[in-house]
A protein has these predicted regions:
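Aromatic-lined carbohydrate-binding surfaces of glycoside hydrolases
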Residues: 74, 81-168
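Short hydrophobic beta-strand segments
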Residues: 1, 79-81
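Contiguous, structured surface segment used for ligand recognition
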Residues: 1-72
Length: 168
């Protein structure tokens, strides 16, 4: 951990026998590792979704004296809403139901994101822990303010109208 760096930032330095990644925090390390994989191994942010082919290598030479310093983001919270998550939730990759979500969250991190709305309703709850475990901030869709369940799901027998049920 490098306390002199701003949040989410990293520095990569290479000398004769060491590749040193220092970061301000966990997300800084994640971004740094993904930058190493992009810059030196050619792994693109959308590698999974684009079926990027890979070849096995003996190793990779990184020039001595290489210094990579991340830049601060201009926007504090950067992310996306996994819309139509029901389509992802029915897709299994390598027999793992959560792998499409893991790959969506990894892509977000590779692009410099730090927050996600993993969907709405019951499906969203399934993937919040996965997103949080990957270091992402969880936020909510406008249909679920402060994480509240949608009215129609919570009260399926009532007409969803505030003027009739203000206490709900």
């Amino acid at each position: 951990i490098n306390d002199t760096l701003p949040a989410e930032q990293y520095t990569l330095t290479v000398d004769a026998d060491t590749l040193l990644l220092s970061a301000a925090d966990d997300l800084g390390f994640v971004y740094g590792l993904f930058e190493i994989s992009r810059r030196f191994l050619g792994v693109q942010p959308f590698w999974f979704w684009n079926d990027q082919p890979f070849t096995v290598r003996e190793g990779e030479k990184i020039p001595v004296g290489t210094v990579v310093e991340s830049k601060s983001y201009k926007v504090k919270y950067r992310g996306w809403f996994v819309n139509d998550e029901t389509l992802l939730s029915h897709w299994k990759v390598e027999r793992r139901a959560n792998l499409p979500f893991v790959m969506a969250f990894e892509t977000l991190l590779r692009l410099g994101g730090n927050m996600v709305i993993p969907g709405t309703g019951k499906n969203a709850v399934l993937y919040r822990r996965t997103a949080a475990d990957m270091g992402l901030i969880i936020t909510h869709h406008h249909a679920e303010p402060l994480g509240a369940e949608m009215f129609a799901q919570a009260y399926p027998d009532l007409e969803p109208m505030y003027s009739k049920y203000p206490e709900k």
